[in-house]
């Protein structure tokens, strides 16, 4: 028997569900691609990127055969670049396997695929009765059932995962998962939820106890760190110097001009011009402040061995962090 909560959401979804292109297929590749893109990305922006990826890489084999630079370049502007690297690695895994994994366990073995993404793919593509638990699901369940356990605690994750699975109608897993996510995204929103026209308001514990704005509960966030960056864009006879960022730090694998951090700028031959100062750029756990300089010289300065010189006109072939993209807009030929 389907739980009354699930039945109400399915009825609501039949009338109010979002029409998204990846919902018109059971092919796991476009579904997986959409789930990865939509992590930390609004649907309005993510939809455009999904179309670009599907056009450039219509199958998982096409994606697997691409270079990492090509994938990062197409991803540019979405942020959280580890998603793109994991996507590319997982595509190679799938190609090596010969086909997309068809079980929840098999899908979880793919690089970068966690519990939520695996459950989404398993239910949407293969009809497996695997409940999704994302931010929308946490919010809907915590409010409706009046659960105050912090959603980012170990106890909370277990409690909500168990409840989500208990409520899931096995024969309609895909529709229900989409329903509860859409309900959280458009109806039971973080701020100003539409409680006055909610189809399950009569049984909502948070509404009846005036706790809607207090749920879900989260543990205190991590401390935000501040970094001050000085970038020097070196231009010599139509060429510029860039390097690939190393592993273990932000923007791994992307390209950047000369970075000087926590040190004064050394003397250079040529003309050094400050173009932008204290440009603020916010990441998840960091706030960056960047100064951007242009160094124009007639001879190439000595740089660390990881730097390469490229024609300035070729810069758009390299995947850059969004901050560097913004800073290079200050340049004139």
Positions of the model-derived regions?
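Intrinsically disordered, low-complexity, charged terminal extensions of DNA damage-control enzymes
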Residues: 1-18, 24, 185-333
């Amino acid at each position: 028997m389907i739980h009354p909560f699930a039945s109400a959401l399915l009825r609501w979804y039949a009338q109010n569900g979002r029409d998204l292109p990846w919902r018109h297929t059971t092919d796991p590749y476009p579904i997986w691609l959409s789930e990865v893109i939509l992590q930390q990305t609004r649907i309005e922006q993510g939809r455009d990127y999904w179309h670009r990826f599907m056009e450039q890489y219509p199958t998982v084999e096409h994606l697997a055969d691409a270079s990492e630079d090509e994938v990062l370049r197409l991803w540019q502007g979405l942020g959280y670049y580890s998603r793109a690297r994991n996507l590319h690695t997982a595509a190679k895994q799938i190609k090596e396997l010969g086909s997309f994994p068809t079980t929840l366990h098999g899908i979880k073995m793919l690089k970068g695929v966690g519990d939520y993404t695996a459950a989404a793919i398993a239910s949407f593509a293969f009809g497996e009765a695997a409940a999704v638990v994302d931010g929308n699901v946490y919010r809907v369940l915590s409010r409706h059932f009046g659960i105050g356990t912090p959603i980012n605690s170990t106890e909370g994750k277990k409690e909500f995962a168990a409840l989500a699975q208990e409520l899931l109608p096995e024969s309609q897993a895909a529709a229900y998962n989409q329903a509860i996510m859409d309900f959280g995204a458009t109806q039971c929103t973080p701020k100003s939820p539409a409680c006055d026209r909610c189809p399950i308001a009569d049984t909502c514990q948070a509404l009846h106890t005036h706790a809607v704005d207090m749920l879900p509960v989260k543990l205190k966030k991590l401390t935000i760190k501040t970094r001050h960056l000085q970038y020097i864009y070196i231009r010599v006879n139509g060429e510029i110097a860039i390097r690939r960022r190393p592993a273990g730090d932000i923007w791994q694998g992307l390209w950047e001009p000369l970075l000087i951090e926590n040190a004064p700028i050394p003397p250079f031959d040529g003309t050094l011009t400050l173009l932008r100062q204290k440009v603020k750029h916010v990441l998840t756990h960091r706030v960056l402040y960047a100064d951007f300089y242009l160094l124009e010289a007639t001879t190439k300065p000595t740089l660390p061995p990881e730097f390469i010189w490229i024609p300035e006109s070729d810069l758009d072939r390299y995947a850059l962090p969004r901050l560097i993209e913004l800073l290079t807009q200050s340049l004139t030929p």
